[in-house]
Amino acid sequence: MGRDEDAGSALEAAIRELLATRAAAATICPSEAARKVALERGSAEEDAWRSLMEPARMAARRLVDRGEVEVLQRGLVVDPSTAMGPVRIRRAR
């Protein structure tokens, strides 16, 4: 498994774990998953999580495709492949 695939799997797991610790209707920001994975990897750089932001959004898209989560903007469910700007992630309803 390559580093990108490894990061993708880790980010998917982080999204699931973060949502599992929140209320059923709660949302998370993709940056929370990126920060979690960067921390778990022991990155010494304070902003190492930033390079994981697009992979985190891609991980969320894969989870949407599997029916596990929904991506929202301004409180509305959106297509993550066309969403521009800040998004939130919640468990699928």
Residue ranges of each PLM-predicted region?
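Short, positively charged loop/turn segments that connect secondary-structure elements
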Residues: 37-58
